[in-house]
Amino acid sequence: MLVIHRRTTPQATWSAELHLTYEARSKSRLRCFSAAGEDVGLFLERGQPPLHDGEFLEAEDGRIVKVCARPEALLHVTCRNAFELTRAAYHLGNRHVALQVGDGWLRLLDDYVLKAMLEQLGASTAPLEAPFQPEHGAYGGGHHHSRHGDEDFNYPPRLHQFGVRP
């Protein structure tokens, strides 16, 4: 099994690729297979942003692994004007929907209930098979409503850290 514990900087060459859906890229613990069929175990630091398309990982044995976003069934949303697009984004955000934002469009994982809501708001929707790379969110850490185990969700915010540079 190829065991991976850490992310690494972009590399010119790599020896394996992982083709993962957004849901799989969001997990810190995952058993999956490389594009070549090798068994892979991901054991990444908890509380980090999801893996993104083109990110690199380093395996315990020193091999470099490239992450590739697997195409998924999406809804491509457009509207007649910026106000309607903003309103659609507001209603999706109010439902905590993972959302990819582009110039004049939104994308979300295909969902017939959300599709109906968007069409009632006047948006146009079209099915699309493409990699999904939604916005991570302004504050970083995981969203939850739990009171038990709150210490596990004590991640530093990504916004309002004035003067702090990565």
From Swiss-Prot:
One of its GO terms (molecular function) is unfolded protein binding. Pfam families: UreE_C (PF05194), UreE_N (PF02814). InterPro entries: UreE, UreE_C_dom, UreE_N, UreE_N_sf. SUPFAM superfamilies: Urease metallochaperone UreE, C-terminal domain, Urease metallochaperone UreE, N-terminal domain. Keywords: Chaperone, Cytoplasm, Nickel, Nickel insertion. The keyword Plastid does not apply. GO terms for biological process: protein folding; protein-containing complex assembly; urea metabolic process. GO terms for cellular component: cytoplasm. Residues 132-156 are annotated as: Disordered. It is found in: Cytoplasm. The keyword Chaperone applies. Belongs to the UreE family. Involved in urease metallocenter assembly. Binds nickel. Probably functions as a nickel donor during metallocenter assembly. This is Urease accessory protein UreE. The lineage of its organism: Bacteria, Pseudomonadati, Pseudomonadota, Gammaproteobacteria, Pseudomonadales. The gene is ureE.
